[in-house]
Amino acid sequence: MKKRGVGLATMWYPVGPGGSNPGTARFHMDADGKVTMFISSPDVGQGSSTALAQVAADAIGIPFEWITKVVAADSDESPADFGSVGSRVTYVQGNAVRICGEEMQTRLKALAHEIMNTSTDRIAIVDGKAHDIDGKIEPVDVGDIARREVERTGQPIEAVGSFAPVGVYGDRVTGQSIVYPTFVYATQIVEVEVDTGTGEVRITRMVASHDSGQLINPLLVEGQIVGGIAQGIGMALSEEVMLRDGRTLNPSLSDYFLPTAMDIPDIEMVHVETDEESGPYGAKCVGEPALVPTAPAILNAIYDAVGVRITSLPATPEKVLEAIAAKAAA
């Protein structure tokens, strides 16, 4: 017999702890207006370099395609950074990139002032051109500004930006700490089908609702959520490192069971976009948060289906059958 159940789990996740957690970015613009970004948060498949390049382009006021190279985590050239951990990259490194881009825009305005003969507060850098906000002066291409500066100095236009989240540790009056500047939130709902004869659990539907702030790149956010849910499904149903006397009993993927594409259901996503004032263009983060509520929601769905609580992961067919049998015998 197969029974279905629905489970729900909600989580919060802290972003960018204050203290020793700075981020730095360095840009240089060549004579054609194209920009190289130097950052230290490695992109290991999550798409952070793409998202950060989008932030940079917006902050400078140039097309995204003008960010032609991203040098990430090169110990010879990149600034120091804490790394791609703790779902911090969009918030911490993103703010550093935004600040660096704004500094480069300030430099471009100062150089455009010399060409356009108007004050910098009357100049806007938009879509790769310096515009007079009154429209009385012909726009100047950023590439022309950059070429003029390189011809004059022999150096590209450079800018540096840094950001460090603020944390309050042990306030002297209240004794309270504010370690994290912001948090992300998520709720996930899952429907499962449990075979009471074999103990097998099959996920039939998943809904994931996440507050990640403003989405810089919605497609990358959805990829992160799908990846986190896939990891959570493995944690909940199949993945387990078996140890005996300090030795791993299942050291290969032939006996350490990862979920495949056949195990991942269609995932309905609901984005709750809030505007985080301290984040880069309102963004917060997404990454690990997608993993957090997945296994609890699955275990709650198993309970809803067959009335048994699985209290250790993974919820293998053997554990589910044992729990069903124990309930029947009670």
Question: Can you say where each PLM-predicted feature lies in the sequence?
Answer:
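Conserved short loop/turn motifs at secondary-structure junctions
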Residues: S41-P42, R98
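Conserved strand-to-helix beginnings and helix N-cap segments that scaffold or border functional pockets
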Residues: S49-T50
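Conserved beta-alpha junction segments in alpha/beta enzyme cores
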Residues: A9-A31, I39, Q46, T182
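Immediate post-signal peptide segment of exported/extracytoplasmic ligand-binding proteins
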Residues: M1-R4, G33-T36
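C-terminal catalytic domains of large/alpha subunits in multi-subunit enzymes
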Residues: K2-A9, V15, Q54-A330
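Residue-level signal for tight coil/turn positions that link beta-strands
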Residues: A31-D32, D127
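Short, aliphatic-rich beta-strand segments
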Residues: K34-I39, I203-R205
